[in-house]
């Protein structure tokens, strides 16, 4: 028979409340310890935080006192190159870019005259090559405090070109929108509203049209002259696919300056311009314009920094003089987007001045040459304007208006 444990044995244990009091009454002098004793003779190693990139940069250079006491050393070519380049892009995909030289940096346009011209253009649904081609001189040409000094090169026949030159940022399409029949009238209205004395008209190439847009161009010039006959008009045209009759039509429409850009040397033309634009064809356009109206000033522009050679540039200037071109401009090619040709060289202002003098020595009437000079740069226009007025028997207002000082940027 199983033994029975007496239940009353638990009555001999102290009450639970009393037990808790006894525990609380135990002196606290005793200290808790880990089950495994720690050897305090060995110091605990300190884990250093990974230094940041900023701290690395700070620690890599001398202190201020050390820096002041360092002897001056000339920059090595490697140091100079490092200052001209920068690494951009996300981690793992960084690439090296070349910073723009100081002489190519321009202010951001933001003043009342710039805003007014832009508002007028939008209201009349007009386009400018200044915006479409991302011209660096837009703050200078649009932002002048003197209204008569402001220049905006109106781009006719829309903002979409049928050609795709590798240096130009204008939109391209095989089938651009149809021409706006009201554009000639709107253009004449805008130019008369601004009160300018000298205007520049250009256009996209329209190979989709039978006449290349020559009649539209000529109509616009005639409308401008009807509104204000004293306005001097420069037309920067395409090559009309080599149709010299269309060149003659525009040249005889009443303009004062016929411009067509060569863009580069003969050897680089196939790599820089659209395959339909040919070096010899452009020379024939300038020659045909001069023959159609000998009193016209003919003008062209060449970009530097594309990898051209000195001898090729000399040959281009000689070719232009053979067809009696009066004015040439030199400017720095600046890559508009990553889709376009890379800049081979940033040409210094001193080299631009050398080519300006060489052009004048060859017999050109005028040459504007500088990193920021473009084919319709206002410094050149001021000089041409006074040449035209002089031919018409108008007194030149001032020596400053010739723009000779502004020609070299």
Swiss-Prot record:
Reaction catalysis annotation: [[Fe-S] cluster scaffold protein carrying a second [4Fe-4S](2+) cluster] + N(6)-octanoyl-L-lysyl-[protein] + 2 oxidized [2Fe-2S]-[ferredoxin] + 2 S-adenosyl-L-methionine + 4 H(+) = [[Fe-S] cluster scaffold protein] + N(6)-[(R)-dihydrolipoyl]-L-lysyl-[protein] + 4 Fe(3+) + 2 hydrogen sulfide + 2 5'-deoxyadenosine + 2 L-methionine + 2 reduced [2Fe-2S]-[ferredoxin]
Residues binding [4Fe-4S] cluster 1, per UniProt: 130, 135, 141, 376
Gene Ontology molecular function, alphabetical: 4 iron, 4 sulfur cluster binding; lipoate synthase activity; metal ion binding
Primary localisation category: mitochondrion
Transit peptide: 1-34
Positions that bind [4Fe-4S] cluster 2: 161, 165, 168
All copies of domain Radical SAM core, residue ranges: 144-365
Documented EC number(s): 2.8.1.8
Stated family: Belongs to the radical SAM superfamily. Lipoyl synthase family.
Protein name, as recorded: Lipoyl synthase, mitochondrial
